[in-house]
Amino acid sequence: MDIAAQRKIDRIFGSFLCRVFSLFHIKRTRPGKTPRVDKILVILLSEMGSWVHAHAMFERIERKYPQTSVSVLLFKKNREIVNILNYVPASDILAIDPSSILTLLKDILRVWSDMRRIRFDTVIDCELFHRISSILSFLSGAAIRVGFHPHTQEGLYRGNFINRPVLYNPYQHISRQFVTLVEAIESETVPKAKRMVDVEAPPPKVTISPSEIDAMRNRLQTFWSAGVAHGRKLVLIYPGGGILPIRAWPLESFCRLSADLIQDGCCVGIIGLAEDKP
């Protein structure tokens, strides 16, 4: 299922479900203290790059709630990057396959059952533009539901059942925004966690097996043996925008950059996804 179809489903059915669930939330809401945080579910569905930016958030969770078990919910295509970053054990990863409407519905029902079985008490919804993530946070049954909310600003309607609403700040890096979501769990301000948070987490470390390193060295050796890059620095460029081509530079800009790098003595290689091939 392409991105346009996903957006259409999210806009039509997602908006309706968000409004319905908001009515249930109004009837069930009761004031009270923050429940104990024992089981956290982090929802970050579609953005592979956001998982890298979420490193500081997972560091903050581990430091602030060291005895808490953490699970993640993502789209199936991003499972590999989470395994590489090793945020949580593979057994604590819940995955949804959005490749078709049937697999999407089937996996949502399965994940719904899993969430109810695990009994999460806290859900951190890291999405900005998905209604499905806020719906899943409601279906989880968690008492604490943290997520971005426009408050008085214009923004995507994602329901009113996020009971730890965080105001998104476009002037702060998203990695800092993710840490703010963790701080909002026990925040008493309105909006939640308004103060500037400190982010001191080191860059994420990736563990690569010796066999993978050897395989890549062999590929590069084949490239070098052709004499093309002998004695020159190799610069890899990804000129595509993935599922959102609007993010990509114009192709002419990549061409000029490549020409400048070659002029400086570098060897330029082009990388990309299978669907990027002409």
What kind of feature is each model-predicted range?
Residues 1-278:
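Catalytic machinery of carbohydrate-active enzymes
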